[in-house]
Design a protein with these regions (language model features):
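Membrane-embedded alpha-helical segments of multi-pass transporters/permeases
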Residues: 3, 44-52, 71, 110, ...
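Hydrophobic alpha-helical transmembrane segments of multipass membrane transporters and ion channels
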Residues: 34-42, 74, 78, 163-167
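Helix-loop junctions and terminal segments of transmembrane helices
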Residues: 1-34, 86-91
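Short helix-capping/hinge motifs at transmembrane helix termini and TM-loop junctions
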Residues: 50-52, 58-63, 93, 116-120, ...
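Membrane-interface helix-boundary motifs at transmembrane edges
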Residues: 22-24, 92-94, 145-155
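Short runs within selected transmembrane alpha-helices of multi-pass transporters and secretion channels
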Residues: 6-9, 67-117, 122-146, 199-204
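Transmembrane alpha-helical segments of multi-pass transport proteins
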Residues: 105-108, 155-221
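Interfacial segments at transmembrane-helix termini and the short loops linking adjacent helices
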Residues: 30, 47-77, 83, 182-190
Length: 226
């Protein structure tokens, strides 16, 4: 997830600046945000639904911390979305605002770690990152709407998050009801294969949901370039 975000960042920043003066640039930025969210959701689910396989790769000594992986993935997803919405202060020349937004995130991270880490250990650090990026994202989005309004479709983005949450929830419900105790490496191969196949079906459902939610948006993005 972090690798994809860094790749996107290096490619997107010149892309945004190059089109800043175009008539349909703001609409294009909004559509880019939607596809970015959908692709990050794919990465998140690609790891979450096949977490058993990744657990085999990293070894037994580190499996106790696998539970925080989805939290960290969501955190990095928010970080990437923060990069998208924070382009406003670069495009509007208000880069000094970045300092205050970053400080707000630092305060949240510090407070969560100081208060909760003694009791919850690395879980506090994971949720501290999540809370920090969420606060920074909200602040940046609110300020961006004031100083450099971009017509983000928050309903569509929210629907993508609901879709991601629904797929995660269905997979956990299915695992508890049908595959309790089934794990790669310690269970019969047939049970693991069936479990992973059903998870693949859920991933296909996510694809279908994204196709429905983003229908026509790619053509609209191309139209802004004309």
């Amino acid at each position: 997830m972090n690798l994809f975000i860094q790749m996107f960042r290096f490619a997107a920043e010149p892309f945004f600046f190059q089109r800043a003066q175009n008539k349909g640039s703001k609409q294009l930025y909004a559509i880019v945000m939607e596809f970015f969210t959908a692709f990050c959701g794919l990465i998140l689910l690609g790891v979450f639904l096949y977490l058993d396989v990744f657990a085999l790769i990293i070894g037994k000594d580190f499996r106790s911390g696998m539970g925080v992986v989805p939290i960290m993935l969501l955190s990095y997803m928010l970080l990437g979305m923060l990069f998208n919405v924070s382009m406003w202060y670069k495009l509007s020349g208000k880069t000094n605002m970045a300092i205050w937004i970053t400080l707000a995130g630092l305060v949240v991270t510090t407070l969560v770690n100081v208060i909760f880490m003694p009791k919850f250990s690395f879980w506090a650090a994971a949720f501290g990152h999540l809370a920090s990026y969420l606060v920074m994202f909200i602040i940046s989005a609110v300020l961006g709407a004031k100083y450099y309004p971009i017509p983000y479709s928050w309903k569509r983005i929210g629907a993508l998050f609901v879709l991601i949450g629904a797929v995660c929830g269905l997979s956990m419900l299915m695992d508890n009801m049908m595959f309790a105790g089934v794990n790669a490496g310690s269970s019969p191969a047939s049970a693991v294969v069936v479990k992973l196949l059903l998870h693949t079906v859920l991933l296909a459902v996510y694809f279908a949901g994204c196709a429905f939610l983003l229908k026509g948006r790619y053509k609209m993005a191309l139209a802004t370039e004309e």
